[in-house]
Amino acid sequence: MPAGYASTARALSLPMSPSGTPSPADDDIQSPPWGHLIPNRQNTPSPSIREATSFRDQITSQATRLLYRMKKTWRRLNFWQRVGAIGAVILAILLGLGFMIFTGQVFLWLEPVAETWEQSKLAFFVLWLCVFFVSFPPLVGWSTFGTVAGFIFGIWKGWLLYATATVLGSTCSFIVSRTVLSKFVNRMMERDKRFAALALTLKYDGLKLLCMIRLCPLPYSVCNGAVSTFPTVHPLMYGLATAIITPKLLVPAFIGSRIRILSEQKGEMSAGSKAVNICSIVLTISIGVFTGWYIYKRTLARAKELEAKERADIRRSLQADHAAHRPHGSFSEDPDVNTAASILARDEEERIGFNDFDDDNVDLVIDDESGSDNSSGQTRKHLQGSYRDEFTDNDSDVFRDGDGADSETYHLHTHVRPN
């Protein structure tokens, strides 16, 4: 008997199950008393540890993805593009430092004339125009002008100037940006499904979500241009949302008024008064930053919730229409909402697989056995079709016609993708 057969025979002669079951005593010997874990008590981290670990993992994951995207983008750039990118980063840093230095010099320059300009209507109008025009992207300086308004005119008069110019400026910027960026909006709606989903979420609680967006710490002029690209947002609604959040504008006006008090009474003010004013400025900035960050997180969570709800509604509608074998109708009477929903519906159809698979149709690929590559390619090209379980007047019945006089043998390979 060959060696291979002998080894196989020995393997088959071995028992299929263990010789005996272990006794409880053996279990006690193998496992010490401290090895027995109390269920639901051991190896279960506390909620605070789980939340900390989850938050840390999210930060690490986001940083890893951002680093990967930066490396991927960097590899695609040629030499001169890399030089330009490095130059742009250096220029942005220098501009930021210069803006901070310039802002400090502005208050030093305004200190001698602030008392005179406080009663000047021309100064009020000029500063109002400055706040109005920085609403258009990509201009900057909106927050600085708000602080200057509080520095010159005080907290309440400065807030009135700042709020009215902000509401009118943001509304006009919204209208102009939508007119100029109309082609860009159409391209974004067609290419980016996330853009269509975000635009569609604004139809639920659009005013509430717009107010949350306006409270987020986003660049002011850029935010005006970005929100204008959502076709479901109307200019009056955007202006109303901006007017609702105008109490937020008291923060820069208050900071400006405190800075003026510190600059005017720095020789006469006691250390305690200085500490109170400085602490009030720091506390106001901290509250503004924390509130902006919190609202930003809540805005993202609400947008994801509304997007999931909209996708679920569209998915149910698609499945119902598919089961009833009827074409999809319009999703809304509003053309902008219907456009965004239709784009999102195509994305859902691709996810579900309605575009790639039909229960009544099976793709057949007919391969000729002749062995010729040319004939095989032509057969696949001309004889690939869809099998249907009913016949029309133009289709032939194989049970009536038979195999024919000159029959050929084919292999039928069905390629069916599971749903």
From Swiss-Prot:
For this UniProt record, give its keywords in alphabetical order, as a comma-separated list.
Golgi apparatus, Membrane, Transmembrane, Transmembrane helix
| Subcellular localization | Golgi apparatus membrane
Spans traversing the lipid bilayer: 83-103, 122-142, 159-181, 236-256, 275-295
One Pfam match: VTT_dom
User: Which region ranges are annotated with the description VTT domain?
Assistant: 150-259
Sequence segments annotated as region (Disordered): 1-49, 365-419
Q: Which residues point to the Lumenal side?
A: 1-82, 143-158, 257-274
- State the membrane topology: Multi-pass membrane protein
Record-level GO BP terms = mitotic spindle elongation; vesicle-mediated transport
According to the UniProt entry, which residue ranges have a biased composition of type Basic and acidic residues?
A: 387-411
| Cytoplasmic topological domain | 104-121, 182-235, 296-419
Q: What is its main location?
A: Golgi
Q: Kindly list the GO CC terms recorded for this protein.
A: Golgi membrane
Family matches, as InterPro entries: Golgi_membrane_TVP38/TMEM64, VTT_dom
Q: What is known of its domains?
A: The VTT domain was previously called the SNARE-assoc domain. As there is no evidence that this domain associates with SNARE proteins, it was renamed as VMP1, TMEM41, and TVP38 (VTT) domain.
- Which protein family is it in? Belongs to the TVP38/TMEM64 family.
- Report the protein's function: Golgi membrane protein involved in vesicular trafficking and spindle migration.
**Protein name listed in UniProt:** Golgi apparatus membrane protein tvp38
User: What is the taxonomic lineage of the source species?
Assistant: Eukaryota, Fungi, Dikarya, Ascomycota, Pezizomycotina
